[in-house]
Amino acid sequence: MNTQNQIKENIEIEHFTSDESEKLGFPFSDATIVDNIIYVSGQVGNRPGTTELISGGIGPETTQALNNIKSIINQLGSSSEDIFKCLCMLSDINDYSEMNQAYRMFFDEVKKPSRSTFAGSGLALGAKIEIECWAVKK
């Protein structure tokens, strides 16, 4: 038997959508779990269960996006300590420094995950930041 096929047969894929996100009807899952890795979809700084962005700019939006990620991985039995990679997408690279301040505070008590950051335009809901994360499922 081909090893690649054997590996594919043993991979489990699970899709997770929170009750709050389910109400919004987005065409994607909050997270996809492949074996023991959680891939969290891009999160913006919206209030859970709404499309309303938190006010105050990049700092509060960053904190809220990370709290949204934390909520998702907590519901899956993991914690912020289990996050090992983040991808931050900014609508304006000039927000990099202020985003870093909020990001640093969020990960202050845990080991900081590896991260990539870039800027583009047209983020979902008009957000200033969107963050994807990968975490180990406990």
Name the predicted role of every residue range:
Residues M1-N67, S71-E81, L90-K138:
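N-terminal presequence-like segments and the immediate start of the first folded domain
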